[in-house]
Amino acid sequence: MTAHEVNFDGLVGLTHHYAGLSFGNEASTRHRFQVSNPRLAVKQGLLKMKALADAGFLQAVIPPHERPFIPALRQLGFTGSDEQILDKVARQAPRWLSSVSSASPMWVANAATVCPSADALDGKVHLTVANLNNKFHRALEAPVTEALLRAIFRDENQFSVHSALPQVALLGDEGAANHNRLGGEYGSAGVQLFVYGREEENEIRPARYPARQSREASEAVARLNQVNPQQVIFAQQNPEVIDQGVFHNDVIAVSNRQVLFCHEAAFARQKVLINQLRTRVDGFMAIEVPAEEVSVSDAVATYLFNSQLLSRDDGSMLLVLPRECQDHAGVWRYLNKLVAEDNPISAIQVFDLRESMANGGGPACLRLRVVLTEEERRAVNPAVMMNDALFTALNAWADRYYRDRLTAADLADPLLLREGREALDVLTRLLDLGSVYPFQQTGAADG
């Protein structure tokens, strides 16, 4: 059956700021306390979406979350009106205010893990929400992510959206950022590669930075998504690269159809994995970048592998990269050599995503890949699909509500909270989502 990959990109939230909340993510730590520009951030993301849609790629949007997230502060013992809580937490525990104001839901590669219908035992598209257990600010996301996905993938005859795994370290799950699918045509059965950083009985794990994904979680997600057991491979990421800032597998590898583009040091038992894939995937091709051409540290600094690898109509592939790759002489030299060689990657396209990149999120972080047949695509909420009208509407919406300068101190401004809620109220109507946010369900928008 014919199917296509649809990229669902996350819209950057109104409270996008640099707080250094993500230990193990070196860009996040390095840019802590810098002044951010939320309006520029959301527009950089929109420009990427629109450019790819104009080039013929199927593109959709996933909205941001409600931030600052007052219910989490109430759980932490802060009391009073919303405004009083903001004032208290800003004075008593500003770190918590930054955490509940994080715009991290924009990195929807961590929203869920997706199984196309061709790989599922029941013939449905499955999406299992990630619990993002390793970081407090990200562990807040799962309930609203689930509500948003249910509002987008509404048809229960076509889609099954599963709640996140229990919030315990043993089942730490980071979603599609640690998942790749390889195969031939999108509509044919593929091989799903689940990548983990640790497992309970295995002492091989990083020493400096946390391994966020557990094998136990990956196995549970594969079961929930009803992935055919004959089509699954579980592989451990190289703990040494995690300790160099590769906090998700999509910082060191990306796949599309029969191609795996990765660093030579990406996986713990890389030769074994490559041989498995060669046996299981017809026409499999591994493009392994040697350290002598691109070091792991340069890959992390430029996000070479946090790229999008997209199939074009002629069978060739386009590699979508952040501008940091072009700015790095060695990486750019390698890329120009790559597209001149005999492999499916025949073109590269560069985007300026500096606002997201400074928090450690490149092109791949910003998108969730969902393979859909024509019938399944018709069942998706049509209001989220990118086109000229939606691009114009979202830019006007961003101009109206987003600030062009934000610091950590601004997060305590009650006006920012009100601006955000009003913006999301408008957005849910624009995208036909219904009342997906807690403030809409409690009437807090009136208060």
From Swiss-Prot:
Reactions mediated catalytically: N(2)-succinyl-L-arginine + 2 H2O + 2 H(+) = N(2)-succinyl-L-ornithine + 2 NH4(+) + CO2
GO molecular-function terms, A-Z: N-succinylarginine dihydrolase activity
Enzyme nomenclature, EC number: 3.5.3.23
Protein's pathway: Amino-acid degradation; L-arginine degradation via AST pathway; L-glutamate and succinate from L-arginine: step 2/5
Binding site for substrate: 19-28, 110, 137-138, 212, 250, 359
Active site residues according to the UniProt entry: E174, H248, C365
Gene3D superfamilies: Succinylarginine dihydrolase
UniProt xrefs under Pfam families: AstB
InterPro entries, per database record: AstB_sf, SuccinylArg_d-Hdrlase_AstB
Keyword annotations: Arginine metabolism, Hydrolase
Key word Ribosomal protein present: no
Family in the record: Belongs to the succinylarginine dihydrolase family.
Function summary: Catalyzes the hydrolysis of N(2)-succinylarginine into N(2)-succinylornithine, ammonia and CO(2).
Name of the protein: N-succinylarginine dihydrolase
